[in-house]
């Protein structure tokens, strides 16, 4: 909303959200590489076709789980049972959240994959609304607060923060837009 109507919202929080989809450290966090190896967005279209026009968000969870099979198959359960007296509530809460994925229709997921993951058009201000308004994150006039972590293999810091260097040439450019951006990078969480 802030990228289209600058005066409408207050501070904008971005908790580990990918905004610069092409960013990443070479050889780490292979989600983008995995998508490229599949040959683009045809897998998304096929999956939606097989789902009769629906895309089950469980496929996204499956992709994330495959990033670290050792955690999925061993560590997660080991941690639960090694701390069974204290870990059960946290484990159940996380699994409910993690398994509470969203279902999308074919058009929605195809747009997300083509425009964001492949096109990287949000970070480069190339997305327009149906009304023709350009979504430009530089238009946000509220402070932007970003949280990210080196331990996040789904949204590494480069994807959470890379939009800043995609949109602003340098600190002076950022100041010229009157923007305030505060971010923190945790080492492990």
Residues of each region from the PLM?
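Short strand->helix junction
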Residues: 1, 152-154
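Short beta-strand/loop motif that positions the catalytic acidic residue
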Residues: 140, 146-148, 152
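Mobile cap/lid helix-loop segments that gate and shape the active-site cleft of serine hydrolases
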Residues: 98-134
């Amino acid at each position: 909303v802030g990228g289209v109507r600058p005066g409408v919202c207050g501070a904008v929080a971005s908790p580990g959200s990918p905004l610069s989809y092409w960013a990443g450290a070479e050889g780490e966090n292979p989600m983008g590489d995995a998508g490229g190896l599949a040959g683009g967005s045809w897998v998304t279209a096929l999956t939606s076709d097989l789902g009769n026009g629906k895309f089950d968000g469980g496929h996204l969870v499956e992709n994330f789980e495959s990033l670290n099979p050792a955690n999925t198959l061993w560590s997660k359960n080991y941690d639960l049972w090694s701390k069974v007296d204290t870990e059960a509530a946290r484990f159940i809460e996380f699994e409910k959240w993690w398994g509470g994925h969203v279902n999308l229709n074919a058009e929605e997921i195809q747009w997300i994959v083509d425009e964001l993951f492949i096109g990287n058009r949000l970070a480069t201000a190339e997305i327009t609304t149906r009304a023709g308004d350009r979504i430009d994150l530089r238009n946000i006039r509220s402070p932007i607060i970003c949280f990210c972590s080196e331990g996040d293999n789904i949204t590494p810091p480069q994807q959470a923060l890379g939009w800043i260097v995609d949109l602003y040439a340098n600190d002076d450019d950022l100041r010229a837009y009157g923007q305030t951006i505060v971010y923190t990078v945790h080492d492990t969480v």
